[in-house]
Amino acid sequence: MKRYTLGASVRMDGSDLFGVDKKYRFLPIYSISGLWRISNEAFLKPANQWMDNLALRLSYGLQGNIDKNTSPFLLGNYSNQTVIDKNETIITIGSAPNDKLRWEKTASYNAGIDLSVLKSAINLSIDYYYRRGSDLIGYKDLPLENGFSSQAINWASMENKGVEINLQTRNITCLLYTSPSPRDPK
């Protein structure tokens, strides 16, 4: 097994669901990751009698999200309502248009360690993750003299972090002792 592994990915995504300004339509999405297999280092060779794998993992990535319920344009909802005993078709405008809407972004960080011992009878993985969402689309109240009650804008953010622990064991897979079967009295 190799000691070091690096990985990377880059792409450009675009959408016409965002603002009219072209600079908001595209988002570079990328990730980078690395792994150091510590168990293959010379200073750990004596431990390889009982330790099968010890590895440290790190990664970072940026991804985008499209909120398909928003639009940079003025949108209306058609509905039928009864007005003075007549059925009338009306258009209700949801929110003010925003030509500066852009991608929601999520940056993800991850650090982890993997350990396998006793011919992979015990496997342990511990991961720390941190995710930060920015430019999340939400509705902000507007002054009522605008004629609109709210507008979709990129203003929210959110953080998520935690630790994940995964322990797997392979229990005894063979029978160590079997009792003799009773003999047939014939």
Kindly label every feature range from the protein language model.
Residues 180-186:
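A short, hydrophobic C-terminal helix/tail in secreted or cell-surface proteins
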Residues 1-179:
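Extracellular/periplasmic, surface-exposed regions of secreted and cell-surface proteins
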